[in-house]
Amino acid sequence: MAASRVFAQRLASTMKVARPAARIQARTLTTQRMATPFQTIKRQQPSMIQASARQAFAARRQYSSEIADAMVQVSQNIGMGSAAIGLGGAGIGIGVVFGSLLLAVSRNPALRGQLFSYAILGFAFVEAIGLFDLMVAMMCKYV
């Protein structure tokens, strides 16, 4: 097992040494083969087409990808912040529901049970709106 590890390392190092020589030989063979004037023109045509395509694309898009990515991040953060403001509204709504419960029970203590069930129902509605708002805020940021 150890002998195969040593052999594999030596083989890899000799291949690493031999690679540049093989590349140089391949380059000289390809340059010798494509020495005719027709071949050089043929090689230049795709590069001209690619250059004109790049220029057309650059003329169409006047911003860099870094700026576009930064603007997407800023809009996500603004959307999340705007949606998170609604969570404050949910907190205020819960406070109003239980404040009204205290006021109603102080005026008519006999209806305490019925008023408390209505208050729990109002709390559930306000909490559902708050959770929906939190879900929208997370979707603005991460989707």
Curated annotation (Swiss-Prot):
Chain ranges passing through the membrane: 85-105, 119-139
Signal peptide: none
Pfam families: ATP-synt_C (PF00137)
Site residues (Reversibly protonated during proton transport), renumbered to this chain: 127
Transit peptide, residues from-to: 1-62
Topological type in the membrane: Multi-pass membrane protein
Gene Ontology cellular component annotations, sorted alphabetically: mitochondrial membrane; proton-transporting ATP synthase complex; proton-transporting two-sector ATPase complex, proton-transporting domain
Entry-linked InterPro entries: ATP_synth_F0_csu (IPR000454), ATP_synth_F0_csu_DDCD_BS (IPR020537), ATP_synth_F0_csu_sf (IPR038662), ATPase_proteolipid_c-like_dom (IPR002379), F/V-ATP_Csub_sf (IPR035921)
PROSITE patterns (alphabetical): ATPASE_C (PS00605)
Localization: Mitochondrion membrane
One GO term (biological process): cellular response to salt stress
Single GO term (MF): lipid binding
Keywords: CF(0), Hydrogen ion transport, Ion transport, Lipid-binding, Membrane, Mitochondrion, Transit peptide, Transmembrane, Transmembrane helix, Transport
HAMAP family attached to this UniProt entry: ATP_synth_c_bact
Family per record: Belongs to the ATPase C chain family.
Subunit-level organization: F-type ATPases have 2 components, CF(1) - the catalytic core - and CF(0) - the membrane proton channel. CF(1) has five subunits: alpha(3), beta(3), gamma(1), delta(1), epsilon(1). CF(0) has three main subunits: a, b and c.
Function of the protein: Mitochondrial membrane ATP synthase (F(1)F(0) ATP synthase or Complex V) produces ATP from ADP in the presence of a proton gradient across the membrane which is generated by electron transport complexes of the respiratory chain. F-type ATPases consist of two structural domains, F(1) - containing the extramembraneous catalytic core and F(0) - containing the membrane proton channel, linked together by a central stalk and a peripheral stalk. During catalysis, ATP synthesis in the catalytic domain of F(1) is coupled via a rotary mechanism of the central stalk subunits to proton translocation.
Protein name: ATP synthase subunit 9, mitochondrial
Protein species of origin: Emericella nidulans (strain FGSC A4 / ATCC 38163 / CBS 112.46 / NRRL 194 / M139)
